[in-house]
Each structure stands twice: as structure tokens, then as C-alpha cells.
Amino acid sequence: MDYLEKLQSLMENHPSDFFSLWEEYCFNDVVKGDELVVLLEKIKGSTIAPAFGKIAESVIPLWEQLPEGEEKDKVLSLVFDVQTTNSKNLLEIALQQVKKYEDSANYKEALRIVGLRDGITFSHCLGRFALLMHLSEGNFVFHQGGWGVGEIMGVSFLQQKVLVEFEGVLTAKDISFETAFRMLVPLRKDHFLARRFGDPDAFEAFARKEPVAAIECLLKDLGPKNAKEIRNELVELVIPEEDWSRWWQSAKIKMKKDARILAPASSKDPYVFDPKGFSFVSQLQASLSGSNDANKKITSCYAFVRDLGSELKDESNRQLVIKELKALDLPADSALLIQRAMLLSEFLGEKAPELECENIAKLSEDQLFDIVNNIEILSLQKSFLALIHSCSPVWVPVYTKLFLTTSTSMLREQVFKVLNADKEARENILKKVFAMIEQPLLCPELFVWLFARVVDGEDGLFAESDKKEIERQMLASALELMHKVATTSQKDLGKKLYSFLVGQRFLVVRQIIDQASIEYLKEFVLLSSKCPQFTQGDLGVLRSLAEVVQPALKRGTPEEEENILWTTSDSFTRMKNKLQSLVGKEMVENAKEIEDARALGDLRENSEYKIALERRARLQEEIHVLSEEINRAKILTKDAVFTDSVGVGCKVVLESDQGDKVCYTILGPWDANPDEKILSLKSKLAQEMVGKAVGETVLFQGKKHKIKEISSIWD
């Protein structure tokens, strides 16, 4: 344990031991500025600060040994923050330190404000003096109370106030010097926060052009940050949300070659900036020495040779990597052995007998499959697959097995491309694919991947004449798969299929079921109804799509169609409110009317009582009818409206033989308004139009009208 750790440990728990060790520390031959800064900042916020303030002057000999620079100034400023003696020696040092500001117009006034003019009490004087000298129009400060970065708009040494416009406050704020000493931290004009607040457009342009320099600026001024924290500092404030992923990926690639930014071992660890720079080779050595895991060592070497190929121009660096790789004790015929061989061969120019064709040809199908499956570096995995294809007589079964089992999309793409190019392998794959279409649970991930490729026309497996039928088979299997995986660990595949099918207003479904037979569509509707991923609205749309293709489906279910009461959201809310009023208000009032009428006596001749009873009967009937209608109601949504033929939710333009045009909107009975030319779906004219397309004829008021245009009420 070094001095810093020991002193920090004793600070709170053993103060007396701390001061004894501090005396010893003061005689140290080697003085580290960064260590002193950390120690003094800890003391400043600790319970021993008052006691240490009496001996703070003991830091001065250590301070004098430090080289000139920001670190030395920081140490001295901290000494004056904790000192309580206000000695003559400290006063002279302070006056000498602030002499660099003597040309400032407010120099003498600042001396008075911080206590250096009379020299009686001057605690915190250097930090406060530096802040006062920084308080000029156009400079920036940071508010430690949550107001964020601010730009100085004006200063009055007479009133001892500063006017600051903060990013987190709507109006500029007048702040007294006394408050400023406690809350404000001066920022350089090139500080990350100052640049982000002062000229965000210029800083965004800079960050786009020089992403690594922008991140260096952030880490230098704000300290180490992990990826999430970097995102929080930059997204929207510098880089727009929609551009962030692309910008960050580009920045990460470039940062790998920046010697001044140390990349983290994991996503939770921070990026660290060091102006002196880090040695890439020393980073590699530290990574290798810090682990006994051969897999991690191979991964570290791969990252080094992949990202920092220029470092290998130095022969000593190349030999270092070769030595580290060859020193690994690896089992024969293992994925690790093959990965090492490929690194030595492809990146380091070393011969690797394990990769010779005759040796690969000796490996069995199971051995090759296990090796490929256990190679964790994708590019090496793909390279070894290419070797298997070139050298092994059993490459087809290895590729086929991998195609059926891998969950890596890029690997599946490569394997599929090679298999599809070979006639014999292609026939074998087709047999497997047809079996999978029949039973998608055999290879569910592969089925979902292949379904998307077939629909997009990127499979290359099936003849164009067979494609439509294959798509329909796969759609039916997809619905079956969605039903079966809904409550299993593979439910995400069901969600993926759902998103694929409902995207772009069910475009995939519409393309596949176009011109399908009525038998297929009946099965399609039935399978859809079993999928819990579909909402009731989705199921209504799917049924409507099927009915558009085969109108006979409508005629087959007249009762079901008749039972739906289409309504807009506003009308549905209005009717629900009406029902609540009938039940909760009018029925209660009617009950009181009946009770009052009873009190009049002689119910046989009591007309008030009879009227009240009749009103109750009417109310009960109205409540019954309205309740039944609400139960049948279905809110009309954008996805439920189709304009290839007239239906609910459509606006229809009719043209008479004389050229007169009239536009009708078709909605449910609750929304009907003849004055506004809004027809109920159940009206005679609407029923005459429903199911007809543009160009067809409608008989209206004894005259023929042609349908000129069909649009959605949302268009």
C-alpha cells in the first residue's frame, strides 16, 4: 500500500496516525502533483480539515518541488482552501501568485474582496481571485447547484454582482460574488461544456468532422466516462438522436487507433483520456498478463492485429505477438488451436501446418462442425469455413448442418450462398427446407430468416412458377409457428413474425393471399385467429383482406358481419357516456319519481305513478339496446380501411351521366349525418356501393352514377 492509500485510509478512522504518517510523507524525496491534488481534495472535505488547516503550510516545501503548470497551481489553491493560520509567509506567497493579474482593471478591488489587501483572513483566496479575474463578459462558468453552464453577460465590482445566462434557467440571473464563490466554477473557452453551450452549431460541425477529437475534449474536461455516459453528454445536445448510432460506430472504430484514449474492457467500464498517450503494445501486454484464459488472449491478439496493423511494422511488436500466441497451451483439433493458426498465418506471416489442406481433409464431419461452432471470432469463423469448402470432402454435410443450426445471420448468409451455388448441395437443402416448411418448429430461427428472404425474392431456391404457392405454404406455417411459440422461450420469434406480417399495412399478407383460393383463405383466417400476437383489430383487418380476395367469404358469414357496429372513437366515447348517464342519473331520478308517486296513494287512479312506470320501461329498453350495441361496437382504425373497393371508412365520389359529382362518407350508424353526406353503412345507398370498385356503376335516385374515386377518411 503506497502513501496515498495509507493516508486516505487513516484520514477518517485514525486521525492521530494520519498526522504521524503525514510528517513522514513531507520528507518524501519524490513528489507527485496528481497525488497531492487527490490528497488535499480528500482532506478538504473530511472531518480533519480544521486540524490540518493549522499545518497546511507544511505542504509548501512539497509544492515548491513541483514543475510549473496547472497541477502546481491547483495544489497551492487547495492549500489556501484548507489553511487557517493566515500566516505572513502564506500571504507573501499568495500575493506573488496573483501578481500575474496586476494589469487587470479590477486587480486592487479583487485583492480587497478576497482578503489579500489587509492580509488578516484570506482563506480560499487563490480560487476566489482566479474566479474574479475570470468574471468578464463572454466567459463561461459552471453552476454547481444544477443550473448548468452559463455565459457571463455583465459584471459589477461596485455592487459585487455578476449577471449570468444559464442553460437550465429561462432568464439571466444576478449572482452576488459571495454566492459565486460557493456555486460557480470558471470554464475555459475551449472547455467541452463551454463549447457545447456557447456555440452548439460549430461544436456539432467539429464533432462530425473530428469525432475522436470531440470525445478527447469530453474525457479531458469531464473525466473518464463509459459509453452510456458519453451518449448522455452528446446525443441531442451535439449529435441528433437519429444520427447517433452511425456517428458513435464510426467514432469507436477511429478511437481504436487513438493512443490517447484507453478503451474499456467492457461496456460498463469508462474510456480514459491521457494526454501523454498510451502504448498500444503495453496495453496488449497488460491485457495478456492480466488473464489466464487462452480464449481471451487470442481475442486480445486478434483485436490488436486487426485494428493496429501498422504497429506490426515494428518487428519487435510482431515477434511479441507471435511469442505470446505460440506460448499458449492449446488442445489438439480445437477451435482455439485453429484460431491461433489463422492469426499466425493471415496476420503475422507465420506458417501454420494446422491449416494445410491435407490436415483439414483428415478431420471428420463432427470435428469440423465442432471447431466452426466454437470459433468465437466471426471473421476467423468465415475464413475457416472457406478452407473447409476448399479442402474437405465432407464440406456439404458440415455446411448443411451449420445452415440448419447457426443463429448467426452473417454466417448463415455465407453458408447458404455456397450451398445454393452447388447443384448437389442445393437439392439436399431443398429437401430440408420443404421438411421445415411442413414443420417450422424443426428449425424456427432458420424458418423466420428464410420466410423473409422468400418474400423479398432473395432466396434463389425456388422457381418463379412455384414461388406463389411456396409463399402461401410458408405463411400458413408462420401462423402455426406464431401460435406454438407464443408462450415459450422462443416467443420473440413470434413477435418478429408479427412485425413482419403487419408492417406497411399488412403488405406482405396482401401480396401472398392475392388470388388465393377460398379454401386457403378460410384456413388462413382460422390460423390467424389462433395467434395471440394479433389484436382484435388486426384479426378484423386480416379477415377483410381475405374477403377482398374472395367476396364469397362475406356471404358465408352474414350473421357475423351483421353483428359488427362500426364506430369512430369519438362516437364510441359519446355512447358510453350516454349509457352511464342513463344508468347512473336518469334511472336514479326515475326511481325517485316512482317513490314520490307511491306516496300520493291509490295507485289505480294515480296518473303520476303510471307515467313514472312507463318512463322506467322506456329507460330500461333504451339501456338494453344501447348496451347491446356497445358490446357489438368496433372502433374504426386506419388499418381497417381499404380503398380498393367501397367499405366502411371510405369517402366515395360519384359522378352522374351529366357530369355532376357528389362525395359520400360511409361510417357506422352512430356517426351518420345525412346533412353532411355521411351515410350509415347499413343505409340503402351505402349497401348499394359496398364492395364496388372505381369505375363500377351505382343506381342512385333512379339514375346511374359511376364511382370516380375511393379514398380513406384519414387521407
Swiss-Prot record:
<dbReference type="Pfam" id="PF03449">
    <property type="entry name" value="GreA_GreB_N"/>
</dbReference>
<dbReference type="InterPro" id="IPR036953">
    <property type="entry name" value="GreA/GreB_C_sf"/>
</dbReference>
<dbReference type="GO" id="GO:0070063">
    <property type="term" value="F:RNA polymerase binding"/>
</dbReference>
<feature type="domain" description="GRAD1">
    <location>
        <begin position="1"/>
        <end position="502"/>
    </location>
</feature>
<keyword id="KW-0804">Transcription</keyword>
<keyword id="KW-0238">DNA-binding</keyword>
<dbReference type="InterPro" id="IPR023459">
    <property type="entry name" value="Tscrpt_elong_fac_GreA/B_fam"/>
</dbReference>
<comment type="similarity">
    <text>Belongs to the GreA/GreB family.</text>
</comment>
<dbReference type="InterPro" id="IPR028624">
    <property type="entry name" value="Tscrpt_elong_fac_GreA/B"/>
</dbReference>
<dbReference type="InterPro" id="IPR018151">
    <property type="entry name" value="TF_GreA/GreB_CS"/>
</dbReference>
<dbReference type="InterPro" id="IPR001437">
    <property type="entry name" value="Tscrpt_elong_fac_GreA/B_C"/>
</dbReference>
<feature type="coiled-coil region">
    <location>
        <begin position="603"/>
        <end position="640"/>
    </location>
</feature>
<keyword id="KW-0175">Coiled coil</keyword>
<dbReference type="GO" id="GO:0032784">
    <property type="term" value="P:regulation of DNA-templated transcription elongation"/>
</dbReference>
<dbReference type="GO" id="GO:0006354">
    <property type="term" value="P:DNA-templated transcription elongation"/>
</dbReference>
<comment type="function">
    <text>Necessary for efficient RNA polymerase transcription elongation past template-encoded arresting sites. The arresting sites in DNA have the property of trapping a certain fraction of elongating RNA polymerases that pass through, resulting in locked ternary complexes. Cleavage of the nascent transcript by cleavage factors such as GreA or GreB allows the resumption of elongation from the new 3'terminus. GreA releases sequences of 2 to 3 nucleotides.</text>
</comment>
<dbReference type="InterPro" id="IPR036805">
    <property type="entry name" value="Tscrpt_elong_fac_GreA/B_N_sf"/>
</dbReference>
<dbReference type="GO" id="GO:0003677">
    <property type="term" value="F:DNA binding"/>
</dbReference>
<dbReference type="InterPro" id="IPR022691">
    <property type="entry name" value="Tscrpt_elong_fac_GreA/B_N"/>
</dbReference>
<protein>
    <recommendedName>
        <fullName>Transcription elongation factor GreA</fullName>
    </recommendedName>
</protein>
<dbReference type="Pfam" id="PF01272">
    <property type="entry name" value="GreA_GreB"/>
</dbReference>
<feature type="region of interest" description="GREA">
    <location>
        <begin position="562"/>
        <end position="715"/>
    </location>
</feature>
<keyword id="KW-0805">Transcription regulation</keyword>
